[in-house]
Amino acid sequence: MNIQPYLIPLATVQFEEEIKKSTFITYLAHTPSIEDAKAFVDSIKQKHSDARHNCWGFVAGRPQDSMKWGFSDDGEPSGTAGKPILAQLAGSNVGEITAVVTRYYGGIQLGTGGLVKAYGGGVQQALKLLQTIEKKITIKLNLTLDYALVPLTQSIMAQFQAIEVEADYSEKVAFVIELECLQVEAFTQTIINKSGAKVIVAHNDNV
């Protein structure tokens, strides 16, 4: 499992330009899964059902995870739309992203080279407008401790920006926390050392 964080879109972006009387409208959106990506493509197709083409590409997972890539030329000559769109996304180092480029035909043919430039260029320009945030990969841990150790435990949780998901105050205190994977080792060592190994840390199976 790759636990390194990666960038994802913060909000949807739209970029429009006219090339030889054809209007190209590029949309970028955050799509965490292949299903979300296809749903976004469908929504743009419905919005622009009168357009000649709605070409698309997506990176539905990590930027480098080619198993979750997809693209379509949507009637344009093979290799002139979907691949250039995907190439721009794959090179952006942004994950969970879908691009749809809508074309309203203006009567002048662009040729294969012109189409590649138009579709890839639209995504390139839209990416310049895109705001991103870092997605951290997290894991859930179970903490079991005595009541006297609650203040110490909560202090260490705050230090590592751990989120309390559940809390059960019975004979002992049981916390389920969510923590960035990169912090797990340091968090575990810190809480064991400072509590004298009296806080029991275990992985939560219900991830």
PLM region spans:
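C-terminal regulatory domains involved in ligand/effector binding and gene-expression control
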Residues: 1-79, 166, 202-207
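Active-site beta-strand/loop microenvironment that shapes enzyme catalytic pockets
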Residues: 81-129
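Terminal alpha-helical anchor/extension segments at protein ends
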Residues: 116, 122-127, 195-207
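Short glycine-/aliphatic-rich beta-strand segments at the starts of folded cytosolic domains
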Residues: 132-147, 175-177
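Short amphipathic alpha-helix segments
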Residues: 143-162
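Short amphipathic alpha-helices in soluble, non-transmembrane regions
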Residues: 153-159, 186-195
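N-terminal positively charged helical leader segments and presequences
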Residues: 169-172
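Terminal, non-globular segments
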Residues: 177, 183-184
